[in-house]
Each structure stands twice: as C-alpha cells, then as structure tokens.
Amino acid sequence: MDIKRFMVATALSAVVLVGFEYFLPQQNHKTVEQQAPNATPGLPPVAAGGNTSAAPPVADASQPDPRVAIDADRVHGSLDLRGARLDDLVLKNYHETVKAGSPLVRVLEPRDQAEPNLVEVGWANVSGGHVSVPDANTVWTADHDTLTQAQPVTLSWDNGQGQVFQINIAIDQNYMFAVTQKVINHGGEAVSLYPFSRVERGYTPVETGGYLVHEGPISVIDHKLDESSYKSLRKGAVPPGNIAWTKAGQGGWAGITDKYWLSAVIPQQDSDVAGTYSYQPTGGDKGVYDVGFTARTPLVVAGGGGGGFARP
C-alpha cells in the first residue's frame, strides 16, 4: 500500500470510544468526596471482584448469558448482562476487505471467542473495605431489551447488603458510548469505592502496521502520549497486580489500537485518575492485556439512601 492509499485508509477509519463520567454527583444526593489515606489500586484482575460472600447468587454459568441488543446508525451488537461487558460490536458501514460479500468489521468480541476484545467498568474496594462489589459473574438486570440512540439502558444490581449499583449506557449517532456509574447506599454507614474502566484484550494479535502505525496499548494523560508494545507489557508486568506501566494525571484517554481501529476509555476530563497498562497471564503463552483508568479519589457515598455519581 503506497503512502497516499495509507493516508486515505487512515482518514476513513472509524473509532470506537467509551466515555466514563466518574465525578458528577446530582445536587440532591448526599454524596461526599474525600481523599482516602490508602493508595489508589490498579485495575482489578480479570474475572475478579470484591468480597462477594454475602452477595445474592449469580445465574447458572452453564446457561447462555442474557444480553441487551445494540442497534444504532453505525454499529450493532449486544451487551453481556453477565459482568456488564460491552463485548459484541460490529461496524455497519465497514467491511474487512473490498471484495464482494466481505464480512463487516468486528471491533469487540466476547471472552469465549477466538479474539476476545471488550470494554468493562466496575468498582474496587478501598484498602480494608468489605463492600460486596459486582464482578465478572454478576448478572445485572436491564430496564430495556435494546440500546438505541433514542433509548439509553440502565443496568442495576443489588448486593444484598444495602448497596445498589447502576450503570447507565447511552450511544450517540456515531461510535461513542457514554457510561455513567452510580451507587445508591441504603446502609447505615458510608461506603468508599474506586470506580474503574478498562479495555481488555485476551489475545496477542499479529501486528500489521509496520513502523508507520502504532498497534497496541496507547494513552494520553496530561496531554502526553504514551505508546507501548504487547511485548513490553508481558515483560514489565509486576506481581501481584501485574501492572507494567502506570501514570497519574487528570483526564485524557487510554485504549488499545489496531492498524485502523481503536477501542478506548475516556474519563471525565477534570477528574484525577491513574492510567495503567497490565498483563494477566492465563496459562502457557496466553494472557490478557488491560488498559484503563482507576479513580485516584474514592467515591464516598453516605448511608441512609445517599447516592452518586450520576450524570446531571
């Protein structure tokens, strides 16, 4: 491909982005932000959650996962209600090749497929915290069966200990998903949690861009670009969190890019976050790459029906 064709192809490329609005409490909520003394955690391990010993039982893992359909102008797919994962997304207007009958481009794929690639949000406990938080096996309920541009979807899960977790998901006319995380606390005491978001890739792709195009983990934090390789994540991952790279800052974005496609998460641009790249070995030469953000200041939700952080 000559340079002119390359530039045209790049200009025509689509971008899949997910915006996460962390720190926007509604005025009537009893939410209070405060700086906790403990350090900000990295992204939780894949398929791991908090203390779920007192949580309601999850659905039978042998049954097909319940899903919410996605149908917008430029994309279609579905959202997995087990784990609240955005893991099935196809671009309606782009094909893999120029040949007749070529399949549409798939940018997100579930964990049980050959090339898993997905986006996930959640909450992590502060040090010493014991809130039962949703994990990869939590089955959420949805208020609608289909997510469209005109119809956002809200997912809910009650942990049985007084806290109700909610995730509101909306999509625009292009490729942007707006995701709002909210906790309603009916317990008697305040709870402190770190919201997080991440792009997860469960395989090592064959890189095709050469020296002209970066492929792999990428981020911009405090207006500074960082590009890393899959190899550097595998070599640099340090137990117990298997974090290979981290940077604290304000706003920005982070994700994993291919030759033409990018999946990224975008925190609220005035929020203090820690961006991380990590690699979780899963056996043999296989593993999972995670790129994302964790809030540096925990979400503190007052008891007695206090709630936060919903979009205003």
What residue ranges belong to the model's regions?
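Subset of Sec-pathway N-terminal targeting signals
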Residues: 1-46, 147, 159
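Intrinsically disordered/low-complexity terminal segments and short unstructured peptides
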Residues: 9, 39, 51, 137-140
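Generic low-complexity segments that are intrinsically disordered, proline-rich and/or Lys/Arg-biased
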Residues: 38, 42-46, 57-58, 117, ...
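Short, Gly/Pro- and small/polar-rich lid/capping loops
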Residues: 42-68
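Soluble non-transmembrane domains of integral membrane proteins
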Residues: 67, 71-312
